[in-house]
Amino acid sequence: MARCATRTGWRASAGMLRFSSTCQGTWPNAPAFLSVPSSTTILIPKRSLFVLPFGLDVGLLGIGAYYCTRLKKPDPVNVMSIFGPELGSKEAEANPDQVVQCIAHRGAGLDAPENTLEAFKYCVERECNFVELDVRTLKDGQLVVLHDQGLQRLSESSITDVTALNWEDIKDIDVGVTHPNRQRYKEVKLCLLDEALTYLLEKRVRCIIDVKGDNKEVVNGIVKTFETRPALYKSAAVTCFNPATLYKIRKMDPKIVGAISYRPYCFSAQDFDAEHGPTNPRFGDNLPVHVVLRFLDLLHSLLWRWTARWCGVSAVLLHKDTVSLCEVRYWRTLGVRLAGWSVNRPVEKLYWRCVLRAPYLANTLAGEREKEKEVQVDTQSARANESAVKTEKQEKELA
């Protein structure tokens, strides 16, 4: 602290202030107050030599907090048990039956009513041992397997918010009346998460649990489900679009294998594809809100990879139109699995199998076994051609 004595008078001495090193913060012609006694001192703080530029200290603090609070990944053995060996790896060549190529999105929702026991049974019949399902909480705290917040799309019901209802209120609603195969699937009901997991574990079907909502009940419900069913640690992964929700779940139980889901414009638009871009805006009639959501989309696109690593994820589930070979290599270097959704066209499935060499989530299982045979034949023929070329080179060298 610098110490400077104030003189009585109308103006301070300019000469003293000009050559004094202890009063650098005082103006040369600053007026002095008559009422101030001559013995009064004014304390002037000096600027520290270690003060960081504006914003740099906040940035360093944020980086430190990021690395201090980042969660660790779960046991790699559990990750391997769920997702199997990576395509193209030595483990995959040694154990081709354990390679995951197709994951039934919502239990193959185009072939059977989505997120129902009938859909999961259909997957078992089609020899698909990996499904994805969605989970929400009800008013009574139970976890129901359901994607939408309402039931208008799946049934003729006018219910718009199931979180305000109990299980007894919706358990008898037919959710297959609007499905394309409704003639085959009649009187299809919703199911609770416990019912679905009981069946899937019995049939040794692995699953990805997509958590919908960010309330405390769903977080506690997922953690409790894993605690009561230890087999899930090696057969189920938890995913979410909201990294904060996934962080809460994995912080409460770090043994849970986590995955982050991502697609562009998830804040401002309900749908997205590469051909049409973002469609069906959430607040299209409110321009200020729409602009704010677009800004959040921009921040999300810049930060979602950091938030994924912050949550200690073992896999990322990306919209198929955002995935490239560079994206696949990036996550493989980090030891993180990548899967795309939703890949339904036969040509797209072959592209994912043969070029990207990564698993995908599909709404239909039509032709999956045939594609696997085609890929196996192509792989065998490619290896045969390579061996033939090597043999020819060796013969030429010997000759």
Which residues fall in each region the model found?
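Phosphate-group recognition and catalysis centered on beta-loop-alpha active-site segments
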Residues: 2-8, 12-18, 22-399
